[in-house]
Every structure is written in structure tokens, then in C-alpha cells.
Amino acid sequence: MWRNALEGRPLAESALMVRESGLAVVSLCRGGFFPGTDSRVRGKALDDNRLAIEQAHAIGAPSVVLVCGAVPGQPLEVSRGQIAEGIAAVLPDAVAAGVRLLIEPLHPMYADDRSAINTLRQANEVCDRLGSPAGLGIALDVYHVWWDPELREMIEVTARAGRLDAFHLCDWRTPTVDLLNDRGLMGEGCIPLGQLTQWVEIAGFRGFREVEIFSHRWWGTDQREFLKRIVASYRAVVAEAEASV
């Protein structure tokens, strides 16, 4: 669930709607955006993350996905340090609420202003730096990490450490015409989705496989038909993964 869906009504009312729907909330998106050149900016980010944790707890979401943030012109190493400091500051709140914080590595094309954490290795390094706390995990989105030559190894590392909490599916279209909202339906692009799904399953992941397609192109179509296409393409990915075992 995205946080903007909680706007415009009391949080308790949103929580009741979720419970009555019978749906399981996998996570709340999003927290993060910890880096800043101004301490006041970083402080506001901490407040917002604490609010996200409160919201997640209220609606029964087990986790908050972190888009960790970056600042154009600020060295990535500095931003990564501020990310670790920010997570450490709000982690006690998350643990107290029974909510896990999930670091989501983003594709390097977002390293300018969305996230200085761009690989599974970097996400694991943050977890290690903070002492591998129980309240911290990692979300793997194939759109962001499919290109990484270390991907299979780092999936195994992440899973062994008990950090592989989320798995997001979509595809990478060629050419990509929008850096944010041109994701493909599974099978429309070049990501080896069956192979990646098999890797996370072999590593021990047993959670939801979440389809996450940001696409102006698909949003402009009949959404019932889009949903049918999602189901069919998802089943094809699963069949490919199972056939390769």
C-alpha cells in the first residue's frame, strides 16, 4: 500500500477499511529519503519515517519499504552514511511497533536524487554496519537489480542473513522512454524473470511475489484487461521458474 492512499481520512478509518477488505497488506510505501545537506532536512525525514512506521502498525503492514534517498552533488559515500544514521535513529521505533524496515536498492539511474543504495551488496553493507538488527531487511525489485553481475550471489547472502523480505516483479522495456513510469508487463522486456524467480525461491524466499508496474502506457488502458494480462504473464513467469528447477 502507498501512503498517499491513507491521506484524506483518519488513520483509524483507513485501518478499519483494510481489516474489513480481507486483503493482506504486504508493506507500506514508502519511507526513507534520509540524506540532506541541512540537519533540519534530515530531522524532518526522521519525523516522516516515524509517521510511516506508525501508519504501518495501524493498518497491519509488517514492513515499511525504504527508498533511501540521495542529494545531487553530495558524494554518494556521504549520503550512504546519512542513510545508515537515519535508519539507526528510527529503528527503535520500528522494533517497538513490530514493523520491519526494508532497504530497497534502486537502479543506478536513480543515484542522483532517489537512492545512494543501488545494489544488494550495498544494502547488506548497511545492515552489517548497523549490526544486523532484527528489525531491518531488504526488498528486491527486479527492475532495479537485474543487471548486477553479483545478483545471484547476493540473493543467497541476503537470504542466509534472514533479510530477503520482499520480491517485486515487472520487466525492463527496450527502449525505456521514462525513467520512472515505463515499466513493462512481465515478458515485455529483457529481464530473465524465470531465472531470477528461481534464484529467490532456491534461496528460501516464501513471501508474496509482488507485481509492481509503474507505466503511463498501461495505466491508460482498460484496467480490467490489464489485470488479466498481469495474471497471465505472472503465471508464465512462475511456470518458467518451475520448469527450470
Please place each PLM-identified region on the residue numbering.
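Histidine-acidic metal/acid-base catalytic patches
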Residues: 60-61, 117-140, 144-245
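Acidic-and-aromatic substrate-binding clefts and catalytic sites of carbohydrate-active enzymes
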Residues: 1-13, 33-40, 71-74, 109-114, ...
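Acidic (Asp/Glu)-rich catalytic clusters
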Residues: 8-28, 51-60, 91-97, 128-133, ...
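A cross-domain feature marking catalytic cores of carbohydrate-active enzymes
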Residues: 1-4, 27-32, 66-68, 103-105, ...
